[in-house]
UniProtKB/Swiss-Prot annotation:
Keywords: Cell wall biogenesis/degradation, Disulfide bond, Glycosidase, Hydrolase, Secreted, Signal, Zymogen. This is Glucan 1,3-beta-glucosidase. Its EC number is 3.2.1.58. The gene is EXG1. Its main location: secreted. Residues 1-17 form the signal peptide. One of its GO terms (cellular component) is extracellular region. Belongs to the glycosyl hydrolase 5 (cellulase A) family. It is found in: Secreted. PANTHER family: GLUCAN 1,3-BETA-GLUCOSIDASE I_II-RELATED (PTHR31297:SF1), GLUCAN ENDO-1,6-BETA-GLUCOSIDASE B (PTHR31297). InterPro entries: Glyco_hydro_5 (IPR001547), Glyco_hydro_5_CS (IPR018087), Glycoside_hydrolase_SF (IPR017853), Glycosyl_hydrolase_5 (IPR050386).
Amino acid sequence: MLLTFAPIFLLISSIVAAPTLQLQRKGLEWDYQNDKIRGVNLGGWFVLEPYITPSLFSVWSNGEDDLNTPVDEYHYTQKLGKETALSRLEAHWSSWYTEADFAQMKYLGINAVRIPIGYWAFQLLDNDPYVQGQVKYLDQALEWCRNNGLYAWVDLHGAPGSQNGFDNSGLRDSYKFQDDDDVKVTLEVLKTIGAKYGGSDYEDVVIGIELLNEPLGPVLDMDGLRQFYQDGYSEIRNNDGVESYNAIIIHDAFQQTDHYWDNFMQVSGGYWNVVVDHHHYQVFDQAALELLIEDHIKTACNWGTTHKDEAHWNIVGEWSSALTDCAKWLNGVGHGARWSGNYDNCPYIDSCLSYTDLSGWTDEYKTNVRKYTEAQLDAWEQVGGWFFWCWKTESAPEWDFQALTNAGLIPQPLNDRQYPNQCGY
């Protein structure tokens, strides 16, 4: 959930033909060519993120520093031990989401959910501290989708060794995913996911399997990542002789070059129903945080224009309404906010005190959030749609679809516009 900021005044070049129909061996339940996903991410459920559910982590905080606070799920389970960790996480898995959430999503116009899950839910490495039991609740979530007329992506959010070093991969500050043994385990996990969720038992609900969330291209071997994508595709497409027809989702790996993936895994090479996943935030870069609201909007609109001309079907699988990085632990346990000058020697912009609770937001800030949200909705629907990150949090309102909707800052209905035609499409 980190890392993209493109210069807003970058000229959009290399225009190519609009996406063409992708070869389908069998009609998909979802029409990626013509329909729009309007979805939310179920963040912080099966992969812990301290800023989404700080209550799970704050028991170690003394109010002055975070020295004893685990920084991710790996260290959370390691610190507790398997028995206590399982007890606490079972309580979390069974309560953080209920069917009432899914019913409310449907009521608000949501038609799909993206469900992050780590490799450790399916297979453990030797000496892994992680605990298992998530799959039962994943199955329950898919049944709740079925009951409420929602579709789902199953998203492999964390790979062994970590693919990006983010806390949301399960293991922070590690980049060892491309070690041979870790790639092997990741492919085995994809085979397991594909065999169960890519087959006929779930084809009415699961409309995509994401091979890996946010591999950090700038620190990875991109040739190796491309090979992994091809191998992962094969693991799901042809699983013990049973062919899966589901959409295969590949993340863009934060490659900033326009149309980077256009010539990869194309129909002409025998690949079909491939979708590219883009994630867009404008708060993880000092220059982005300092932009005027008009420039935030222009950036989002430019992304929408660029994505519209890509060769592959594509979705914006993560985005938010955030204009600050003020949410506690958003940048990781032990890190402050760039906005307040408490992260990596960043210059001070403003205090975070008025941004961490909706009740403290000024009318001007609420207007800016609504404008920015509407512009992003318009931009992402230039292509195949979107998944907002995320449905709910404990105390991070800029990232909380439920809270923002209740405050009138996400449109209801979703196509309502107080600030129409901001992108000029």
